[in-house]
């Protein structure tokens, strides 16, 4: 058993060294980014040690980083890119829409058409609301659930990422020594600055 642990540790060190060799430009960008962005990025959910690679371009299931390393993307923007990166049909539709305007402070028919398609295809959808992010979606969902049930508490998947608002920034990456019992895990704040009642 100890031999396997040593082997795994050595493999991890070798992989980290290889990563450092392949990504010097990403590291330089990250070092500069830390001067302007907390932690070097606007999204702490996509940070990993020792630093993230910075994407230069993407196509299909591939992303190319600032150092020219071509990687197969198994995350696909947390599974939102179901057609892959930069599919021609989507790029063409986006270009056509951009020519008509970038953003409006008013509704447009496209959202009605998409909402209708989704409600017709998903039987449990009576009505829906589009959001800008998963964080906004879970924040609004919890607010609606509290209003509907009159209850303030809810269950959250241990170790699961559900956005970055206060209510769900709990137990994202938990050290096994702090996790507690598997049947009743400890709720641990994943960030400083959370209100006292969040982890109760």
Where are the model-predicted features located?
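Short, well-ordered beta-strand elements within core beta-sheets of diverse protein domains
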Residues: 59, 80-83, 199-200
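Short, hydrophobic/aliphatic alpha-helical segments
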Residues: 24-32, 62-69, 119-120
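Active-site-adjacent loop/helix segments that line or gate small-molecule/cofactor pockets in enzymes
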Residues: 9-57, 197
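PLP-dependent aspartate aminotransferase-fold enzymes
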Residues: 116-200
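Electropositive phosphate-/nucleotide-binding environments in soluble metabolic enzymes
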Residues: 23-27, 57, 84, 88, ...
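Glycine-rich loop-to-alpha-helix module at the N-terminal edge of alpha/beta enzyme cores
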Residues: 70-151
């Amino acid at each position: 058993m100890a031999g396997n642990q040593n082997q795994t540790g050595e493999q991890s060190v070798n992989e980290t060294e290889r990563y450092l060799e392949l990504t010097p430009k990403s590291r330089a960008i990250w070092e500069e980014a830390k001067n302007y962005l907390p932690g070097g990025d606007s999204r702490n959910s996509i940070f990993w040690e020792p630093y993230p690679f910075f994407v230069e371009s993407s196509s299909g299931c591939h992303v190319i980083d600032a150092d020219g390393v071509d990687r197969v993307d198994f995350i696909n923007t947390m599974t939102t890119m179901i057609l892959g990166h930069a599919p021609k049909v989507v790029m063409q539709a986006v270009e056509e829409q951009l020519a008509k305007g970038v953003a409006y402070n008013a509704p447009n028919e496209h959202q009605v058409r998409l909402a209708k398609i989704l409600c017709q295809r998903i039987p449990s959808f009576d009505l829906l609301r589009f959001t800008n992010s998963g964080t906004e979606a879970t924040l609004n969902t919890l607010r609606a659930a509290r209003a509907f049930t009159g209850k303030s508490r809810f269950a959250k998947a241990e170790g699961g990422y559900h956005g970055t608002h206060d209510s769900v920034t709990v137990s994202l990456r938990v050290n096994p020594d702090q996790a507690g019992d598997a049947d009743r895990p400890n709720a641990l704040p994943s960030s400083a600055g959370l209100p006292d009642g969040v982890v109760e």
